[in-house]
């Protein structure tokens, strides 16, 4: 499976396969845990084997019942996930020409994981936040996140949190003039069409509103784009990294 991931990435085909498969790996670990087992050695490459195109985990070590407290059990499960992600982090770094930095979305994902690890989150929360990261989502899931964050931007209970994040985090500095003439002129025609349909300022709030509307137009009016993958690719090209930065600032 991981070989597929890299082949797909390198050939720039089927990015979707790439992302879902990584998510499946994390889900698979959750299934081991739900059976009352833990692995205990996922930091070591000797516990993985490739069979065909699939990466299999071998040498599952033990039973969570060996531990006396819930806290120990939770820590053990969490350690499995961090070990798996640590292994993948090293692996991506070594296999991608130029390292992870050459694949911005991948870099964002591992930065997120490393930040989440420092926050002492419960196992369930940690696993969910990691598995729901935009890097692991398909096009529709990624674009739907803009809808969710724009909803939070307007909802009374979350408005303040979103406003503070968007205005105070330096992560958004790069997006403050997202609507420059050169960007707008370079956009694919369906993106420009949605842009010209309303008045948008160069503020980050309006960028979020625009992306929400892009998703809305696709679903409500059948956009000229053809598929959500094409919409997602356009967004990833012209407004690269914005979704990942939103996720980082609004999810933890
Ligand atoms: C954009 O704003 C201008 C000035 O406020 C207004 O005249 C125009 O009708 C607006 N356009 C749209 C598409 O809302
Ligand atoms: C970008 O937004 C600013 C307002 O913040 C507006 O004056 C400008 O015309 C917009 N640029 C384009 C290319 O639409």
Predicted regions and their residues:
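Conserved structural core of kinase catalytic domains
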Residues: 1-16
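Short, flexible/disordered secondary-structure transition segments
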Residues: 33-44, 99, 123-127, 137-145
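Regulatory extensions appended to serine/threonine kinase catalytic cores
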Residues: 141-252
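C-lobe/activation-segment region of protein kinase-like
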Residues: 54-120, 125-127
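Activation segment signature within eukaryotic-like protein kinase domains
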Residues: 21-22
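Catalytic-loop of the protein kinase fold
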Residues: 29-52, 57
């Amino acid at each position: 499976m991981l070989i597929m991931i890299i082949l797909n990435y390198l050939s720039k085909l089927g990015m979707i396969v790439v992302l879902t498969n990584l998510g499946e790996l994390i889900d698979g670990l959750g299934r081991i845990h739900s059976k009352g087992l833990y692995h205990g050695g996922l930091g070591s490459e000797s516990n993985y084997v490739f069979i065909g195109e699939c990466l299999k985990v071998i040498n599952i070590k033990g039973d969570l019942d060996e531990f006396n407290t819930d806290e120990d059990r939770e820590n053990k499960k969490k350690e499995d996930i961090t070990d798996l992600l640590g292994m993948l982090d090293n692996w991506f770094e070594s296999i991608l020409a130029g390292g992870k930095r050459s694949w911005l979305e991948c870099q964002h994902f591992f930065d997120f994981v490393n930040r989440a690890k420092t926050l002492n989150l419960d196992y369930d929360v940690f696993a969910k936040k990691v598995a729901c990261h935009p890097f692991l989502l398909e096009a529709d899931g990624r674009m739907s996140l803009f809808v969710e964050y724009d909803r939070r931007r307007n909802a009374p209970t979350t408005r303040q949190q979103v406003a503070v994040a968007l205005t105070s985090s330096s992560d958004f500095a790069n997006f403050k003039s997202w609507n420059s003439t050169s960007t707008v002129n370079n956009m694919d025609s369906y993106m420009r069409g949605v842009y010209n349909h309303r008045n948008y300022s160069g503020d980050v709030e309006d960028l979020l509103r625009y992306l929400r509307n892009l998703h809305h137009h696709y679903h409500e009016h059948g956009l000229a784009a053809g598929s959500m993958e094409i919409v997602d690719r356009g967004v990833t090209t012209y407004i690269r990294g914005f979704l990942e930065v939103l996720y980082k600032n609004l999810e933890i």
